[in-house]
Amino acid sequence: MSAYTAPSQIAQRQLDYFNGKHVLVAGEVEDLFPLELAEHCESVSVFTSNYSYFRQIRGHSTITSYFGSQLEADSQADLLLLYWPKAKAEAEYLLAMLLAKLGSGCEIVVVGENRSGVKSIEKMFQAYGTVNKYDSARRCSFYWGQCNTQPNAFNQADWFRHYSINIHGQQLEIQSLPGVFSHGEFDLGSQLLLETLPSLSGKVLDFGCGAGVIGAFMAKRNPTIELEMCDINAYALASSEATLAANGLQGRVFASDIYSDTADDYRFIISNPPFHSGLDTNYNAAETLLGQAPQHLNNQGELIIVANSFLKYPPIIEQAFSNCATLNKTNKFSIYHANK
């Protein structure tokens, strides 16, 4: 069984495309194929918005790795290897941002699972040049093309979606980049959580902050709290920072792979935990969030989360805290609470 994802396996079949190239890898890359690629190329650099993946690859000396919502560094790459992301809007964003950096003449290879909508590259790339499919395997597709026009300059501010919410009389302006959970809209789970939250005090962590809706609401309604907001996704961090700024609010926003970079003395941990990874359902992060929460709360600490009611979170919370209460419930979502 291969250690590589299916998109990497189809790229591995076509190594001749990469020989002698300076390759920039971006998108939904999840494995260590870039290390093998480095053996066939002049250079390999990886741009990722996923902090967990960045932590996995940043220690390897044969590649250069970057984490962020946009690539700030200069690049000598002449070939972009794009792993198709789950959100079409994120693919558009990555193409606009990275091709503006690499310029006309840059080659592109796109790999992705067919169910992810990778076929969309055929139409999406027309603004830059031509791209064609050259291989199919493992329910994936391999495209090659070349940018033959000078891409427009990239301005991240143009890519934010803006929307307003009003809960309990609190009016908030939300800023959201492509690739962020519930991009450009207010999800019903978070709404139920905000309607249920008690008054807060002390040091509060918004875990998996997304576009910053929960953190901004908590800061506006409880102006004396010490707010921290973390996420694994760089687009979420940039969105949360923009949301706080748009509402004149203060908070520390930082990257964390679950609890990798968090404190251990929170009065409250508040979350709408993620349970999707790429195209698949993945409970690992949420289970670690819940199971290890007591280690990151102070002696009076409390955990409050919203979750789809079908998810079996109460037993995990009960095991970690020896208590779990349901504060609110609809036919789709539940609000769970636990005391340390």
UniProtKB/Swiss-Prot annotation:
Xref: Pfam families: MTS, MTS_N
Catalytic activity: guanosine(1207) in 16S rRNA + S-adenosyl-L-methionine = N(2)-methylguanosine(1207) in 16S rRNA + S-adenosyl-L-homocysteine + H(+)
EC number(s) recorded for this UniProt protein: 2.1.1.172
Statement: the UniProt record of this protein carries the keyword Methyltransferase: yes
Top enzyme category: transferase
Keyword terms, alphabetized: Cytoplasm, Methyltransferase, rRNA processing, S-adenosyl-L-methionine, Transferase
Recorded superkingdom: Bacteria
Location, primary (coarse class): cytoplasm
GO molecular function terms listed in the Swiss-Prot or TrEMBL record: 16S rRNA (guanine(1207)-N(2))-methyltransferase activity; nucleic acid binding
Gene Ontology CC entries for this record: cytoplasm
Protein localization: Cytoplasm
Described function: Specifically methylates the guanine in position 1207 of 16S rRNA in the 30S particle.
HAMAP family associated with the record: 16SrRNA_methyltr_C (MF_01862)
NCBIfam families: PRK09489.1 (NF007023)
Family: Belongs to the methyltransferase superfamily. RsmC family.
Subunit annotation: Monomer.
Protein name in the entry: Ribosomal RNA small subunit methyltransferase C
Source organism of this protein record: Vibrio vulnificus (strain YJ016)
